[in-house]
Amino acid sequence: MMLSPDQAADSDHPSSTHSDPESLGGADTKVLGSVSDLEPVEEADGDGKGGSRAALYPHPQQLSREEKRRRRRATAKYRSAHATRERIRVEAFNLAFAELRKLLPTLPPDKKLSKIEILRLAICYISYLNHVLDV
């Protein structure tokens, strides 16, 4: 499932939200913008005749902070780094579930459990152990 830049902002790694563009892609890195980047801005002379390319597209310094963030996130380098961070996060998450699974008694012992089953079984087992300690 693809996320829009607005949805992705909520799920990004916290350290990536305060980085400047040069640290992620460099000043000369090519970036992809959104469709709104292609809309012409008002021309300085206002005569409506075909102006220069600079008059049709906003200068990077004229972009809002949010638009700069969207462009930075569109770089291949940023996407690759984000994918790497996400892969590491998911691997750590799965490893934690595997460790929790090893601590839970099941029959048969090698039965494959889903993550929700592991959590529910852990809740029941902890409740049981609390009850045993209280008696």
Curated annotation (Swiss-Prot):
Q: List the disulfide bonds.
A: none
Subunit field text: Homodimer. Interacts and may form heterodimers with STAT3.
* Its biological purpose: Transcription factor which binds the E box motif 5'-CA[TC][AG]TG-3'. Involved in regulating energy expenditure, body mass, voluntary physical activity, mating behavior and reproductive longevity, acting through the hypothalamic-pituitary-gonadal axis. Acts as a transcriptional activator of target genes, including Ndn, Pcsk1, Mc4r. Is also a transcriptional activator of KISS1. May act centrally to regulate function of both white and brown adipose tissue.
- Protein name as it appears in the record: Helix-loop-helix protein 2
Say what happens when this gene is deleted. Answer: Disruption of the hypothalamic-pituitary axis in both genders, but female pubertal development is influenced by the presence or absence of male mice. Altered female sexual behavior and reproductive longevity, with fewer pregnancies over a shorter period, abnormal estrous cycles and reduced ovulation with aging. Reduction in neuroendocrine gonadotropin releasing hormone-1 (GnRH-1) cell number and altered location of these cells, and morphological and functional abnormalities of the adenohypophysis. Ndn expression almost abolished at the level of the optic chiasma in the hypothalamus.
Would you tell me the Gene Ontology cellular component terms?
Answer: chromatin; nucleus
Q: What is the annotated localization of this protein?
A: Nucleus
Q: Which GO terms describe its molecular function?
A: DNA-binding transcription activator activity, RNA polymerase II-specific; protein dimerization activity; RNA polymerase II cis-regulatory region sequence-specific DNA binding; RNA polymerase II transcription regulatory region sequence-specific DNA binding; RNA polymerase II-specific DNA-binding transcription factor binding; transcription coactivator binding
